[in-house]
Amino acid sequence: MDVETVQAGPALAAHLQLQASPKPQVKKYYFKKKTSSSHSRNGKDDVNHDSTIQPRSPLSRQSLTFDAIPTYHAGAFYEIDHDKLPPKSPIHLKSIRVVKVSECTNLDITVKFPSLQALRSFFSSYPAPGTGPELDERFVMSSNHAARILRRRVTEEELEGEVQQDSFWLIKPRLYDFAAPQQVPSRTLCLPPPPAPPAATLGLTADSCLLTTLKCDGAGWGMRRRVRYIGRHRDEAPKEASVDGYDTESSVREVQQPPATQEVKRSERNCKRKREAEASSKDNNGDEGKKNNKVQGASKKISKKAKKRTVESKDGDPRHGKDRWSAERYAAAEKSLLNIMRSRDARFGAPVMRQVLREEARKHIGDTGLLDHLLKHMAGRVPEGSVHRFRRRHNADGAMEYWLEPAELAEVRKQAGVSDPYWVPPPGWKPGDDVSLVAGDILVKRQVEELTEEVNGVKRQMEQLLCKDDGDFGAERDYSSLKEKYQRAVRANEKLEKQVLCLKDMCENVVQMNGELKKEVSAFKEKYEHIADKNDKLEEQVTYLSSSFLSFKDQLVVALKLELAPSEAVPRTALFVASGEQMTGTVIQGGQDRAERKSSFRVCKPQGKFLLPSMASGMTIGRGASSTCPAAATPGPGIPRSTSFPSMPGLPRSSRGPVEVVAAASGLDEHVMFGAHFSTPPSASSTNDAAKLQLSLPSPRSPLQPQKLFDTVTAAASGFSPQKLMHFSGLTRRDVDTSSSSSGACGSGLLEGKRVLFDADAGGISAVGTELALATPSYC
């Protein structure tokens, strides 16, 4: 193999370099090449073929003997001999078995052949019968080379029967399983190759290496060079093992140098020579002596610096170095960088740039030398106690970017057989799955083709349906009308839905208002019931009061009739009104002029009670006495009495009768006592002093109206007229002038109490005044 072949394929050169090593697994494809059968096909003997055809330049243009050149037909397929291919032939041609002659001239012959991409596309699809792959590659060769390379013509029968088989186009089809491409198992690499002829070893090596390279998924086409850095204090740096099966920047390190005794001796000898030279030339040139001194000092500094720069390291790890930084500082700085990259979520596909990482790390790492050293040499390292590995590389713009990856990813790459140091398993990938790009491309292509066929079938069916619909115009019109009706129904349905929503909202509002109204009605009902209860109680009280007044009226009329005759002989009438424990007496004088008579009767709390005449029999009325109530006039304990009353002017003596009214108050009750002919109304019992006369006022809205005390006929028969009883029937309130009455303890109580004026001579009551009966009741 010459230099041109190595330049044509970088991967081929790398493979040849690996073949020089004693590993036998590189020769795994050598035994597949059979040169004897190829020579027998051509019908020529191997020895005669080599003796008659001398090696020439691939593009030689010397004169040719036309009788020795075979005739080639344009459009015919020929089988090629790979051993005779020139070095500058296309690299893809080394894996092709047959080619097609497209053009023939006296000097050149042009052949066409399919590329590997065209073969993949052809075999991954479903080719039609009688078709072949696309011949997208072309190669022009001389007539002499064509005579050596094109060994035989492919027959028509063979072409028709095997054109759709991969063995027809490829020399080793098992390496190109286009249906399910997989790599050759690694265990086959350990099989020793069978012995091959010495003459064909080089060609087979190139052929096998080429096929192996073509079979790769694309990760091995690049060229990587190992850079070895040798410092000024090192003559040669030993080769170190790469990290995770690939070279990184951290693979090149300064290692510990053995004791540099020879360098020290050499420097000492140089120093001695310089000192001797300085001593010999000291007298001749002083400047040269100074210069030599400077050189000597510089050499000493260099030797000391070389001693200091010896680094003690293990496995190329700078964390164990003791030159400038301790292992603790290394660990702390690496931890800071790891935390920063974790906080920024630096991962593959979303790295962090060097400038950003350095600016952030400067806040935690003060030594810029240590920081720059770590940024340069931390790639491929796994910090202590972490499960992530530092990675870095240059992006397309040339900027350095850093990220973190799982520490076990390197072992996964090694087990998967991927040589790309930046390969990341795709989502859903499992150990044992194919990692080649070709497998994924073929699978995607098949799926796309299947989907395309399904879509085409659907399109055909739609076209057929459209054709049928075009013939039936009535159905189309019906369909359009039904579609319009459906759209109208949809619009009407939408309107109805809106109306239903509005009605629903209104119903909810009405229900809410109904609930509020129910609450208000219940509240009003409770108030009404309360008012009705009050009204019932008031009506009962008014009814009771009316019955009391009626009974009082009847008794009063009867009493007045009975006392009408005796009252004429009585000169005056005495009235005792008791309020509390005091009693005030007033003497009412009767006269002919009744208009001059003034009297009033006021009933205050507590309520009054009438006494029978027998209870007032012990009372005596003294004539001409003062208005005070003496103790001798008291009928019983607690009731003051007055024996004499001052005569009132304007009243005749004949009208003053022995009528006595006593009002006694005990606790909350007030008892009013009239003459002997006055009886107690049925509502007020005379035997029980604690009985009360409820003087409840009628309601303003009560249907009960005040009634007349006397009937007209009865009043006329008795000598009373309605005009005389007008004040009594209406119960008109009148104020009494108390200035003319005498003052005293009993008199003040009489004036403050209730007053009643009786006219015995006239046989009636001139006026009756009371606050309870006269005041118009009102309720809140």
Curated annotation (Swiss-Prot):
Q: Which Cys pairs are S-S linked?
A: none
Q: Which InterPro entries match?
A: DYAD/AMEIOTIC1
Annotated PANTHER family = PROTEIN DYAD
The annotated region (Disordered) lies at 32-60, 237-327
Role noted for this protein:
Plays a fundamental role in building the proper chromosome structure at the beginning of meiosis in male meiocytes. Required for the transition from leptotene to zygotene in meiocytes. Required for homologous chromosome pairing, and initiation and progression of meiotic recombination. Regulates meiocyte cytoskeleton organization.
Q: Does the keyword Cell cycle apply?
A: yes
| Coiled-coil region | 448-547
Report which gene this protein is encoded by: AM1
Q: Which UniProt keywords apply?
A: Cell cycle, Cell division, Chromosome, Chromosome partition, Coiled coil, Meiosis, Nucleus
Q: Which organism is it from?
A: Zea mays (Maize)
**Transmembrane parts of this sequence:** none
* Top-rank taxon: Eukaryota
Mutant lacking the gene: phenotype: Sterile phenotype due to male meiosis arrested at leptotene.
Give the protein name, as stated in the record: Protein AMEIOTIC 1
Where are stretches of biased composition, namely Polar residues? Answer: 50-60
User: Which biological process terms from the Gene Ontology are attached to this UniProt entry?
Assistant: cell division; chromosome segregation; meiotic cell cycle; meiotic sister chromatid cohesion; reciprocal meiotic recombination
Q: Name one GO cellular component term.
A: nucleus
Tell me where in or outside the cell this protein is found.
Answer: Nucleus; Chromosome
Provide the primary localization.
nucleus
